[in-house]
Every structure is written in structure tokens, then in C-alpha cells.
Amino acid sequence: MPSRLRKTRKLRGHVSHGHGRIGKHRKHPGGRGNAGGLHHHRINFDKYHPGYFGKVGMRHYHLKRNQSFCPTVNLDKLWTLVSEQTRVNAAKNKTGAAPIIDVVRSGYYKVLGKGKLPKQPVIVKAKFFSRRAEEKIKGVGGACVLVA
């Protein structure tokens, strides 16, 4: 007949938990974790984990990582990078100074051309612009400013 509870549930509240008196179910006879991989567990490591120990090849000392790191933002998300107040002010006085959106400060490097911009001029600062993004920004009377 199948038991409803697992053995561990039945043993709750019993100090020895089925392992006899003090010290009978010994603590960590082979060491903890991966201990002894080069010594008493050598056979297991050699058989099932070949190449676990040791090094191969040479190190590349001056390797530049993340050279191609270039987070992008699309035009349809451009206005979400500025505050609500800036958006309202820009919509009110269309003849005044165009608002400046610095995408680098928001963590983006490149502006891509997906989506539409509202018909009001805006100055966008970024490290890179796609061709279509530049066309669309200039199409609404804005400007693209390259920053280092």
C-alpha cells in the first residue's frame, strides 16, 4: 500500500532521523563539495569530468571586452527619456527653444529610426544615429548632435 507521506515527513521530531545514535551516521567522510578531486576522488574526476583541472593555451593580456557595446533607442521611445514637464512645455511653445534630449545620459548610444516623431523640433544628442533616424529628426525641424 503506498504511503501518503515521504519518509522525511515521518521522521520529523525524531532527533536521530533514522541514522542511529550520536556520531553513527558520520559527518562528511569524503570531505565537503568537490574536495579531493586531485586526491581521494581522483577516479571519479578523471572518468566523468576530464579536463576539469589544469590550464590550456595562452592568456590574451590586453583583450578589449565589449568593444561592440552600443545600446540603442528608437525614435518612438525618444520622448520617454525626458520628464513629463519638458514634454508639456515643448508642446505649448513650438516657436521657443527646442528641447534637448541627451540619450547618452539615459544610457543609450545610438538612435534608430523606428516609429514617428511628433511635429515639433527637438535637439537629440547621441554617439551614433542611423540614416533614417537622422532624416526623421531633421524632417520635423530638429537637429542631430554627435557627442564623444
Curated annotation (Swiss-Prot):
Family stated for the protein in its record: Belongs to the universal ribosomal protein uL15 family.
Main localization of the protein? cytoplasm
Q: Which residues carry this modification: Phosphoserine?
A: S68
InterPro entries xrefs: Rbsml_uL15_N (IPR027386), Ribosomal_uL15 (IPR030878), Ribosomal_uL15/eL18 (IPR021131), Ribosomal_uL15/eL18_sf (IPR036227), Ribosomal_uL15_CS (IPR001196)
State the species of origin: Macaca fascicularis (Crab-eating macaque)
- GO molecular function terms attached to this record: structural constituent of ribosome
Which gene name does the record give?
A: RPL27A
Task: Write out the ranges of the annotated region (Disordered).
Answer: 1-39
Name the UniProt record assigns to this protein:
Large ribosomal subunit protein uL15
Any single biological process term in GO: translation
The record describes its post-translational modification as: Hydroxylated on His-39 by MINA.
> Which residues are recorded with the post-translational modification (3S)-3-hydroxyhistidine?
H39
Tell me the keywords, alphabetical order: Acetylation, Cytoplasm, Hydroxylation, Phosphoprotein, Ribonucleoprotein, Ribosomal protein
Highest taxon in the source lineage: Eukaryota
Q: What does this protein do?
A: Component of the large ribosomal subunit. The ribosome is a large ribonucleoprotein complex responsible for the synthesis of proteins in the cell.
Q: Where is the composition biased (Basic residues)?
A: 1-30
The cellular location(s) given in this protein's UniProt record come to: Cytoplasm
Coiled-coil boundaries: none
